[in-house]
Amino acid sequence: MTEILRIELVSVNPESLEKVSRMFKEIADKMGVRVKGPIPLPTKRLRVTALRNPSGEGTNRYDKYELRIHKRIIDIPNPDERYIRSIMGITLPDDVKISIVLM
């Protein structure tokens, strides 16, 4: 039975997300571990519309705010223990959240 190590990266900054996913892929290439990904998932957009004027008068008086959440998935079939230990030592930027699951 094959095990799959799934790494899910989430960030609002796409540049730092790409940098971290590149680091995971480079470590896997150095150790000779096979990697599937990074697979980009659809970007979630959180939108908030707020009325500028509290009195309610005026037509085009709205502020629109948007937050985009980017996700990447990296799958590693049959992960090596050395690879798992080496990715645990990576320092991540503050805006990148990571989830590691062994399936």
Curated annotation (Swiss-Prot):
SUPFAM superfamilies: Ribosomal protein S10. One of its GO terms (biological process) is translation. Gene3D superfamilies: Ribosomal protein S10 domain (3.30.70.600). The keyword Transport does not apply. PROSITE patterns: RIBOSOMAL_S10 (PS00361). It comes from the Archaea. Pfam families: Ribosomal_S10. GO terms for molecular function: structural constituent of ribosome; tRNA binding. The keyword Chloroplast does not apply. Belongs to the universal ribosomal protein uS10 family. Part of the 30S ribosomal subunit. HAMAP family: Ribosomal_uS10. This is Small ribosomal subunit protein uS10. It comes from Korarchaeum cryptofilum (strain OPF8).
